[in-house]
Amino acid sequence: MKNFLKLNVKEKNIQIADQVIIDETAGEVVIGANTRICHGAVIQGPVVIGANCLIGNYAFIRPGTIISNGVKIGFATEIKNAVIEAEATIGPQCFIADSVVANQAYLGAQVRTSNHRLDQQPVSVRAPEGIIATGCDKLGCYIGQRSRLGVQVIILPGRIISPNTQLGPRVIVERNLPPGTYSLRQELIRTGD
């Protein structure tokens, strides 16, 4: 595939910076037209990256990832076995694993999706019809379309964030959230002189 990419980069207007690693040992890497892969990124197939995407410096795209058209991935973000739908933006230093990020969602810097339970039990999902036992040891979350997540949001395994939801910085998503705006209440206490 590296040879294919090298032969068709100009034709498809794909920009691959120096020191990018495209590893097809485990599967093919497909990159769409007008996509830019920045310095130091690592992509391990099988991976599909759509057209008009930006993969930031030192991003790590791991096997099983599908990135749709018009997606922006920030500096040093790691994505594993996830679906990133069209026009989503994932900020710098995020970790997205075994999850779905829906169309036009925006994730600020250092957002984390947890994908396994500390008690090593399978991840379950709470749905309107009840709890679904997935049988999966690793399962991240679903982030609804046009949702906006602030810096350092953490999402626990199997959680669902409804479309058009806004989460302020440092919110920890411990349960499914209906559409709305959520933020932490913080109390600043001055101590000493």
Language-model-detected regions and their locations in the chain:
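Glycine-rich hexapeptide-repeat left-handed beta-helix
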Residues: 75-76, 81-193
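Short, solvent-exposed loop/turn positions at domain surfaces
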Residues: 23-25, 43, 61, 95, ...
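Extended, small-residue-rich solenoid/repeat segments and analogous flexible loops
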Residues: 1-58
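Short, functionally important structural connectors and interaction interfaces within domains
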Residues: 8, 41, 59, 69-71, ...
